[in-house]
Amino acid sequence: MLGVVLLYVGVVLILNGIARLCNVDEKSMAVFNVFTGALSFILNIVAVIQGNYFAAGTGLLFGFTYLFIAARCIFNLDGRLYGWYCLFVAINTIPLAFIDPTTLKFIDFTVGNIYWVIIWLLWGLLWLTGFIELVMKKNLGKFVGYLSVIDGIFTAWIPGFLLLINMFPK
């Protein structure tokens, strides 16, 4: 299930980054955020039903992110509360980077686990930019767009695809 969600997280991060870099209309940007947010939400509710609470808890951080982005874009909402949510998630990415989701213990430093450390920390950096821009009111310019595209490719699309074909490093 993770590979499926990551594939769509990858494309939505890429599209959100391109939208920012190319000044695409926010309502247009909202559409894929609704799709990805809904997919993530539904699949993570399934994970809760199956008793996989760690996967669901971490996965819903993404689902709510994209649903909130979509709502902000469609309804032109004040972004400050979303910015505080971004800080909450960014802080959580620090310990999550070092927890093995299969054992719920501190990771062994295998190649696959080191990739997950880097992936979680890069996601945390992107969420932190939401707090910096929306709460602290510091415009980070094109950096966020480029970071979103890079995160989309290297932390979601490629890992998601590798998970789907069972080739992600252990």
Residue ranges and their predicted role:
Residues 3, 7, 16, 29, ...:
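Generic detector of bulky aromatic hydrophobic side chains
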Residues 14-19, 38-50, 66-73, 91-104, ...:
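Hydrophobic alpha-helical transmembrane segments and adjacent interfacial helices
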Residues 22-35, 75-92, 111-119, 132-154:
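Cytoplasm-facing juxtamembrane segments at the starts of transmembrane helices
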